[in-house]
Amino acid sequence: MTITPIRRHVEPSYAVLRPLLGSQATVLASVLDGGGHVPLTLECLSTPVAWGGAVTYSLRVTGPSEQRLVPGRYELMHPDCTFLLSLFAVAEELRFVHYEAYLSEPL
C-alpha cells in the first residue's frame, strides 16, 4: 500500500518562492510530454518590478532535456507544498531545458 504525503497547496508568491530556490520539485508530465514525473530545480527568481499597481517577476526552473515539457500549466510538487505555474521553455542546452513562469501580485 502506497501512502501519498499530503502537501499544502499554496498560491505562488515572491515570499513563498524565495525560500524554495535551489530546491527540487516535480511535475506530472502530460501525455503530450511523454508522461511520468519530471524533476525541476527552482533556479532563479528575478528582482520584482512595481508597475501599474502590481509587482511582476519571473521564476526560472530547469529540467532535463530528455523530458522536455510542452508549454502549459503544471502543478509543481515540492516536499513542503504544491502550487500551479504556467511554464514556457526559454532556453535549451545539451542536458537541460530552462523554463520561465511569469507572475504578478497586487501592491
Explain the meaning of each model-derived region.
Residues 1-107:
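Surface-exposed, beta-sheet-biased, low-hydrophobicity segments with strongly acidic/polar composition
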